[in-house]
């Protein structure tokens, strides 16, 4: 292996070229910083656009149902997580640029400037000494030639006045030549000193320092680029995991199940109307006038008689009764109990199916899995649903209101519910329920899809009401909120909060706020546990 060449040994006379190399290295490092900053901005914009797209409610699969809807919702959720991965990579890239590259440029600026300034001074001193030595030598040689000329002129003069004059001229020329000689010697000595500094002492050290400076810059550039690739390599494996989750969601699409559920939810259950029959004209006396071609087997009763189809004849006219409309139970509204009162199970009044004024009287429906002696609701079983805050009931003096849903709105259960009365229905979390009646008391009527056609009552606070999804969300990004209740969780990505604490909100997501506390710890927390201030 050949010996390594050095700036001080092989570029001793190329200081200006070395300075240009160092300056070009600085320019390259600045370009690298700008390039990676631009890459970071693109990554951040892509990540934010991806997350914004996934959060856009206009693309929510509300018009679809069943496994296809769930699969597309899974796709949106996993794509949002992929966007979060790119945002995390963007943040690391920004940190690398600001702390790593830009920090190095600022730190090395003074050191680089000092080395170049010392080298330029050393070069200038050498050139000045060389110039002075050259001028002193020329002056010395000129004076020596005058001394020789004066000595030669003296040798040609005869004794007398001219000889005396020539001798004085020679003496003057000799003194000037001696002075020039001394100046020349001093200039040579000064040049030797500067040559020692330039060729053997100061300049070699400067060149070695500049070489080490370049070595460090190149090594750091290599490390920076390697760090970018290393961080970038962390994204694809995580993306593959999210893509696998998307594939599982797509594979779970069940066409027959979706279509059968649609049929079950949409069908009215009514019988097809009977085939149209010819009805002969009834005379004023109540007797039918029958043509000879009419069906002779048609039974006609007079006045108070009955038709075979079940309709009654009054005053000679046939009246066919219409299908009986479904009768819904009337639920009376009752003021809910105060927060400090232990929540009791609803009570059912006496049922009397033979009277028109019969109704079931119920209290406010129970909260999901209530805990006696406490006002804290349990955590929901679904990850995307925020927990309920401690129960706070207020008196509602409004009159009872009953709304019948003729279209059969479909809602999804948030929690398991076990019926405690005969007229109630039981269901599991995520079950689909077809609502046939709403009531302000909180008890609705409906049927569990896919289990039975039985209609019963159930508490409305155990289900997700799709009518609330149309409410516009208030932009709370950047605002402060005050914690109303303590919230403790072991779930990764959720924030423990304490009553009275002040939090900063970054964005809202389906009943959750994402933000940070005063210790700059960022995570999500239930929006119904805080009050925006």
UniProtKB/Swiss-Prot annotation:
Residues 318-327, 340-360, 372-385, 392-405 have a biased composition (Low complexity). One of its GO terms (cellular component) is vesicle. Residues 406-468, 476-533 form the SH3 domain. Residues 126-155, 162-184 have a biased composition (Basic and acidic residues). Residues 5-258 form the F-BAR domain. It comes from the Eukaryota. Transmembrane segments: none annotated. This is SH3 and F-BAR domain-containing protein DDB_G0271676. It comes from Dictyostelium discoideum (Social amoeba).
